[in-house]
Regions:
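Glycine-centered short loops/turns at secondary-structure junctions
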Residues: 72-75, 156, 182
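Active-site acidic carboxylates
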Residues: 1-127, 131, 223-237
Length: 237
């Protein structure tokens, strides 16, 4: 598990600009979605992964706890699967130019729909009534990457909780673009994973300063449970 380290100076800057440390702690579960990014064998399974992130295996219990809490409180769980499709290989050719032919070939073999690498990691607590969205860019919200935004809008979602791998690429890209599309956005500090602590923390810090909130799993679950209980009490009156 990553050692999360957010400098006090960063927290002070956030409080100075927003008035408090956490601006999205008052979660409305019914309007909240957990977005789990790229927790696939192509990133987690040795011998299959084209870009192995061993830290991602460590966050699986927290991802499952979050998914359970979101469902129980009345929210939505969405599993994002990265895909290398013929269309995306053509329309996003600059990615392959940057990676080079050998790495590009490994990624294509690992991330093609129908392959072992494309499948979600077996240890995830996936339920049949969860939602599944395929994306073809780092960000799930950028134009042409997926239908995630339309799916969320159709359900009245205005808040997204970001978990998954890797923190500083697909998770941060998705989180930043979620905020730019006017979703309240939270990155979960101990339910995202990168290759190193340094990359993980740098990503969280950059996001926290300008794009949204960051919270540990326990805090997110506490916020969900508190408002779910309030909603039940109100309905019973």
């Amino acid at each position: 598990m990553h050692k999360v380290s957010i400098p006090q100076s960063v927290i002070d800057d956030v409080v100075a600009s927003r008035g408090r440390e956490h601006v999205f702690e008052n979660l409305d579960p019914a309007r909240t979605a957990l977005i789990v990014v790229d927790m696939q064998n192509g990133f987690l399974m040795r011998g299959v992964a084209h870009a192995l992130c061993e830290e991602a295996i460590e966050i699986v219990p927290n991802v499952n706890r979050l998914a359970h809490a979101v469902r129980r409180s009345g929210g939505t769980v969405v599993w994002i699967q990265n895909a290398a499709t013929p269309e995306s290989l053509q329309s996003w050719s600059v990615r392959d130019e940057m990676d080079g032919p050998e790495r590009s070939a490994r990624r294509t073999a690992s991330m093609a729909p129908g392959t072992k690498g494309y499948e979600l990691w077996a240890g995830l607590g996936v339920k049949s009534d969860d939602l599944f969205v395929q994306k073809t860019r780092f960000s799930a919200f950028i134009q042409g990457a997926s239908n995630l935004e339309a799916v969320l809008r159709s359900r009245g979602i205005d808040t997204v909780i970001i978990a998954g791998t890797v923190t500083n690429v697909c998770c941060e890209s998705t989180a930043r673009d979620a905020m730019m599309r006017n979703f309240k956005t939270i990155m979960v500090t101990d339910a995202n994973a990168a290759e190193t602590d340094a990359l993980h923390n740098a990503s969280l810090i950059a996001f926290y300063l300008k794009f949204g909130d960051i919270m540990p799993t326990d805090m997110v679950i506490g916020c969900l449970n508190a408002n779910a209980a309030t909603a039940r009490d109100t309905a019973a009156e």
